[in-house]
Structure formats: structure tokens, C-alpha cells
Amino acid sequence: MIVAGIGCRKGTSTADIEAVIAAALEQAGFAQDRLGAIATPADKGEESGIAAVALLYGLPLLFVLQPDLEAAAARCESRSDRVLALKGVPSVAEAAALAAGGPDAKLVLSRITLGPATCALAETDSSP
């Protein structure tokens, strides 16, 4: 299963979230039907754009708690000093994808940025 980890600025639109996921899947060479879940930090729970895309795709939306993001931080490949200072992890999208995928999840696409949103893809044998 592929988990899309999402980071975004406050108020990011559904179209922007959908676009960054589509770009990530294309870069990784995956069809949309390989996507099994969308993950984002729990503090993004009010972001309607992320929820709308999960609903549109018929996928579970997994809200990752801060301790779980931090536990996955060592497995992140990208690093933003600004994000680290603000969020406590080097990459929100990567940490969310890895944490939601579980301890055996592996990044198959490091964080990409498209406008106000970021997406990273992790692969896992687990189901959400």
C-alpha cells in the first residue's frame, strides 16, 4: 500500500492538494489506485482541502499525532530547518507518510512541493 503524506499552508485548496498528490504519483510511476491512504499531522485536521481529496478518492484520512511524527523523523530524507523549528520534524509530508505507514514503511518518493502543498509517498505492507 502507498501512503501519501501531506503538508500544506493553512487554507490550501482541494485543487492544490489533488495536484500535488497527482504529481507525486506521476513522479513515482504509480497509478492512483495504488494509493491506500492519505496522512497528515493531526494539527491539519481543520484543513478542508485535505479532507475533500480523501473523500474524493475514497481513501482513509489518517491524522498523525506529534509523537508519532517525531518518531518517524529519523527516517525522513528531506530537511527544512524552518519546518524543523516550527513543527519539530525535518519534513511534515515525509514524517506523516512514514508514521502512518508504520515502522517498516519506506519512502518511495521524497517530499515534493507544488505551490502551497507538499507530498511524500511511503510504501508499506500494512493496511490503514
Language-model segments: residues:
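Conserved mixed alpha/beta catalytic, RNA-binding, or beta-rich assembly cores of soluble enzyme
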Residues: 1-36, 40-42, 122-128
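Structural motif
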Residues: 2-4, 36-37, 62, 105-108, ...
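C-terminal edge-of-domain segments
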Residues: 94-128
